[in-house]
Amino acid sequence: MSQEFKISKELASLIDNVVKKFPSNRKRSAVIESLLILQHDNHGYVTKDIIKALSNYLSVSEIDIYEVATFYTMINVAPVGKNVIAVCNNVSCMLRGSDEILTHIEQKLKIKVGESTSDNKFYLKDEIECLAACNGGPMMQIN
């Protein structure tokens, strides 16, 4: 049986600094940045227990926080390797060879998209739509 996740005083202080940026009735505006803080503290991903703790802390529904966590690609809801590799799969990058780069990475690291290497050093992230540098594509991001 796992223990319930509790937000530490240090993490609460960081989250409080985020919350202060917004009107008092807009705590939900702090969800993305708060998830990133908690993710950083939890080896690169958030769990259901973390989402529940943040829900209680911000008084925002769990489902609202879960929807944010699963919508934004920079938030991981499953364990990932130490270094996260993301290859853009948008049209401009695809036309310039992102598929070939992705295939090369898969072969070199012996993993598929959505997997980590056996030593947990690398995780190949899935579905990155745009890294906002289309003129320099194909683009990829590490960490």
Label every PLM stretch briefly.
Residues 1-143:
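Signature of N-terminal electron-transfer/Fe-S-associated modules in redox systems
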